[in-house]
Amino acid sequence: MADKADKMKARLPRGFVDRVPDDLRAAEKMMATIREVYDLYGFEPVETPLVEYTDALGKFLPDQDRPNEGVFSFQDDDEQWLSLRYDLTAPLARYVAENFETLPKPYRSYRNGWVFRNEKPGPGRFRQFMQFDADTVGAPNVSADAEMCMMMADTLERLGIQRGDYAIRVNNRKVLDGVLDAIGLEGEGNAAKRLNVLRAIDKLDKFGPEGVRLLLGKGRLDESGDFTKGAQLPEAAIEKVLAFTAAGGADGAQTIANLQAVVAGNAKGEEGVQELADMQALFFAGGYEGRVKIDPSVVRGLEYYTGPVFEAELLFDVTNEDGQKVVFGSVGGGGRYDGLVSRFRGEPVPATGFSIGVSRLMTALKNLGKLDVSDTVGPVVVLVMDKDTQNLGRYQKMVSDLRKAGIRAEMYVGGSGMKAQMKYADRRAAPCVVIQGSQEREAGEVQIKDLVEGKRLSAEIEDNVTWRESRPAQITVREDGLVDAVREILDAQARDRAEQSK
């Protein structure tokens, strides 16, 4: 036996989680539904590696001179830096650029997979999480952006989220850029200040207009005493930005009219408003006008969005960690990123896409009761009598017969006795167990114990003697009738579950 001091401590790295069977099944069930919708829209699957050359991630890294800042990086044997992918979009850009001549344009693809962030973990903030993306590369007009929004709406409804419980919110970075240009923040020299303005607007849902006003100005002091320095805009500029965020009207047409008034005279802003008007017409033509909303407060934080931006928001209330009722909020978003593939090509390559946060959407569906995997049935367990090694072949045949009939089954392969085997079957959520002792074998029979029915009856029989004598939920059948008998038990349990779920 190893010395106690030499024992390695089993510990999960911070910011990572283990996933148990129910979580895995729920995720696969959800992603299978998403794939069905994306396939219906004519998108094709593609998969890129978890690792990319660090320079392929480019400006999406917080600091290119410190490759481990923000991403997990290591050096190859040729001293080139490699990184675990930060998102699914930058790898797609590399893939498209590398295969540009052979791919159909527009290139419509979807992919899901793990992404990694080398950031400080916290509640609900992980270093590894799954995304599900769809992108169209090579389509310059806003019909591709509108399609992304419509596809997201269809996806949420296919997953069981009702109309009225979600909204796809749409804005256009060109409109905001027009506003920023109008207040004197044009050009690369004002990039940092523009980013501060974007971050302030992004806090609109959290802090409200007055909180954003403070963040656009000198700064905001929160309840804990922490001070966040503001963008230092003059009052007139603050009013202009707030007028932009408050331009939402009773419907899309009114919102667009309000935005036209805000950006009047600015060519870039007017171009953005026209793109929103074109998208609104497509939403109306497709019957999505009540599901997709033009909303000037949407500001995606990533710098590479160049035109329309969109966000999928769930509108129902949930209880947060402090016991407060809050709106669930965003489960995904995206937009147009015309500059991303162009980095590799040296020519304009328009692109647009949408990314779903898989874990967050799973949480939402569980809250709504739309992702129940409790109907997953454990395996039928064929028990092995103590030290009965010479009849293992017979037990194995029972398992094989059940599997051939499409029934999940396993033979107990541990070294414990019957009591421990029954406990094992219970932990495996087995619907029933199969038992064959020497007497049953001589008679060509097996015993089948319905564990679900047994649990129910055990609550009704309080007398141990009666329990032992009655052997509730246990039947004896001919060995060649095993499959049919097990199927009857499984069918009865399925009917009971269906009845209970009504």
UniProtKB/Swiss-Prot annotation:
Domain of life: Bacteria
Catalysed reactions, as listed in the record: tRNA(His) + L-histidine + ATP = L-histidyl-tRNA(His) + AMP + diphosphate + H(+)
Pfam families named in the record: HGTP_anticodon (PF03129), tRNA-synt_His (PF13393)
InterPro entries listed in its UniProt record: aa-tRNA-synth_II, aa-tRNA-synth_II/BPL/LPL, Anticodon-bd, Anticodon-bd_dom_sf, His-tRNA-ligase, HisRS-like_core, HisRS/HisZ, HisRS_anticodon
Listed GO MF terms: ATP binding; histidine-tRNA ligase activity
EC number: 6.1.1.21
Localization (cell): Cytoplasm
Name of the top EC class for this enzyme: ligase
Keyword Hydrolase included in the entry's annotation: no
GO cellular component: cytoplasm
GO BP of this protein: histidyl-tRNA aminoacylation
Keyword Protein transport: no
Keyword entries, A-Z: Aminoacyl-tRNA synthetase, ATP-binding, Cytoplasm, Ligase, Nucleotide-binding, Protein biosynthesis
Record note on quaternary structure: Homodimer.
Family note: Belongs to the class-II aminoacyl-tRNA synthetase family.
HAMAP family for the chain: His_tRNA_synth
Name under which the protein is recorded: Histidine--tRNA ligase
Protein source organism: Brucella suis (strain ATCC 23445 / NCTC 10510)
